[in-house]
Amino acid sequence: MTKTRILITTTSFQDTPGRHHDLLPADQFDIDRARGPLPEAEILRIVGEHDAIICGDDAFTRAVLQKCLPKLRVLSKYGIGVDKIDIPAATELKIPVTFCPGVNHVTVAEHTFGLLLSLTRLIPPQDALIKKGEWKRSTGRELAGKTMGILGLGRIGKEVAKRARAFDMNVCAFDLYWDDAFAKQHGVERKPTGEDVLRASEVVSLHMNLTDENKDWLNASRIGAMKRGAYLLNCARGGLVHQGDIAAALKAGQLGGYGCDVVEPEPIEKNNPLLAAPNVVFTPHTASRTYESVERQALMAAENMIRVLGGQAPHAQANKL
């Protein structure tokens, strides 16, 4: 029996125990592994002989996709965002691109509030001082009564809204595809534009997809419209914000803090301006990374791949062929 040769680049899929590994038995699959996220040059070096690829946030450009042919039958994205994949090129080249919606929204929402509480209650700096032998108290801020502004009220944004209401926060949001029933049930005020959300909120949380149209959307001009000292949370994509403008606003006090799970590019570069900015809490793109969500996501990514290889429809596909 000829084995199906696949490439797996996502590290959490590889490193986390779970049932997803059982879907790829050694007698059926010949598995190559790489440690992503990989830049274009590195992917070009290793692709071309695989029937299927389970990828993370690797740079699947047109050149990479062309190199994958003629053998590649499916590109299975482990995760939701497909902004690192050239979807028009994949469609033109007849490569199905699958993805994994609905598997990590609770996990990301919990992480969002972890970053927020770290900022408002100054947890990381106080922890660092105590470990240095200093017992120095700081004064933080309450969340109750403040306004949480959510940009992107999809699955993750909705979970953030529910948690904000549990903290007795007011919630406003903007989304092109408004869920009126959810908003009424959970007391979410609809704002006509994203800029209106910025002006109204003490806390702003980004949960938008990254597109060519909204790259660097949160820039100096829009930051200037925010309430002075507002907190910004980004568990979506680093490219949604102009990182230099964020750093400048933090230094000037226009932003009170930045909870940052994502940067552009990743891994973070040594000259990223955010590294020298005050009041930033970083995590290395791990908002969706819990044992529970990894298994859900990995199962769907593996099942999507197996379904397409077997001639069946996947759970979710990002392009129409």
Question: What residue ranges belong to the model's regions?
Answer:
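Conserved N-terminal Rossmann-fold NAD(P)-binding element of oxidoreductases
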Residues: 9, 150-151
